[in-house]
Amino acid sequence: MYRYVALRKRILGVDELHYYDVYAPLTKGVSAHYTYDQAKQMVLDAVAPLGEEYGTIVRKGFAERWIDVFPNKGKSGGAYSGGSYDSNPYIMCNFTGTLDSVSTIAHEMGHSMHSWFSRHTQPAQYADYTLFVAEVASTVNENLLIEHLLAEKNQDPATRLALLNQYLENFKGTVYRQTMFAEFERDAHAMAERGEALNPAALNNLYKKLIVDYFGPELVVDDEVQYEWARIPHFYRPFYVYKYATGYSTAVALSEGILK
């Protein structure tokens, strides 16, 4: 992470890198626009290493219109996969033709395929899966898509940089940041068990110290950053955020193993 912070400081060309600079885009993004048909083919090509059976069912999902694809009046934002034990899995997304939209389809199709295989191989009482593994299947697909696009010989430099930046951002946000959240949560509970006061000042100091430890000496940590813990809703559901980090790490290892 320290090397990433130093790299970000150099690319942005700033004398001081503040915490808010960690979220500034490093690239101009990808201007390419994809049709839904192109997106489907990109996903199918990306998941081909998972085998013929997997690819056949993904095609089935596209052909049978498991996906509510486009934004619409009154439609919720975001994306998710749902369904029940005796139905097909269904996906709600808001496809806009961006590379991020393509990645979202790959991600949500991973959830749906996880559900499909689980429901077709397990009785109802065992077919559900925990959060600990839920993000693995979806993120494997997402990573396979990135690797597939990076491997294209004629990929333009801007898109390649955007893909690499997305990979780095995923690691920062899902592995490092969620681990930092988990450590904050653990230490706050430990303070309570020792009988220490959990007042704002104590929690602010704990959070700010963790940011300094995780991001290193190249980052300027302004005083306002210490209050960030108070706006993070994950802490209302104790001791689960580490699962994002373990899930993403597992997905990266699996996708690399699949491609090798």
List each language-model region with its residue ranges:
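Cation-handling catalytic/transport regions enriched in His/Asp/Glu
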Residues: 1-260
